Structure formats: C-alpha cells, structure tokens
Curated annotation (Swiss-Prot):
Record bears the keyword tRNA processing: no
Species in which this protein is naturally found: Kineococcus radiotolerans (strain ATCC BAA-149 / DSM 14245 / SRS30216)
Domain of life the protein comes from: Bacteria
Molecular function terms from GO: DNA binding; DNA-directed RNA polymerase activity
Gene3D superfamilies per UniProt: 3.90.940.10
Complexes and interactors: The RNAP catalytic core consists of 2 alpha, 1 beta, 1 beta' and 1 omega subunit. When a sigma factor is associated with the core the holoenzyme is formed, which can initiate transcription.
Protein name: DNA-directed RNA polymerase subunit omega
Length: 88
C-alpha cells in the first residue's frame, strides 16, 4: 500500500530518553515497568472473578495492546510514582 507506514509502538514509543527521567537507571526502569505490567495483567485476570484487588490501566488502552506498553505510557505521562526500597 502506497503511503502507509506502520508507526512502531511499545518500547519505541514513548522514547527511552523520556522514560529514564522517571527512574535512576535502565535496569530500574525495566523493573518498574515490569511490576506495573504484572499488576495490569492481574487486574484483567481478576475481572472474571469479581475481585478488585489491583488497579487497572490509568491510560486509554487498545484491544491488542500489551500490558508493558500500557505501563510505559503510564510512566511517561507521570501517572505513577516510584519509591526506592531501603536495604536493611
């Protein structure tokens, strides 16, 4: 098809440089986003059971969008906060 170019989503949108403002390092960003993605997946899993233990997506989602992409967009929009865990 002439004139149509797929715009990449997921890890390329939002850009990594924008996401790194919310975390101390790339590793911390990965852990942060992965934990939130697991919460989003758990939210969708619990809907069928009638439980409301987890918080659902805070941004508008698309049907085929992965939980990690949703988590990255939430982080980029500043809807989540991260606190460092104190080592004992």
């Amino acid at each position: 098809m002439a004139g149509t170019v797929a715009s990449p989503e997921g890890i390329t949108n939002p850009p990594i440089d924008d996401l790194l403002t919310a975390a101390d390092s790339k590793y911390a960003l990965v852990i942060y986003a992965a934990k939130r993605a697991r919460q989003i997946n758990a939210y969708y899993s619990q809907l069928g059971e009638g439980l409301l233990e987890y918080v659902g997506p805070l941004v508008e989602t698309h049907v085929q969008e992965k939980a990690l992409s949703v988590a990255m967009r939430e982080i980029n929009e500043g809807l989540l906060t991260s606190e460092p865990i104190e080592q004992q």
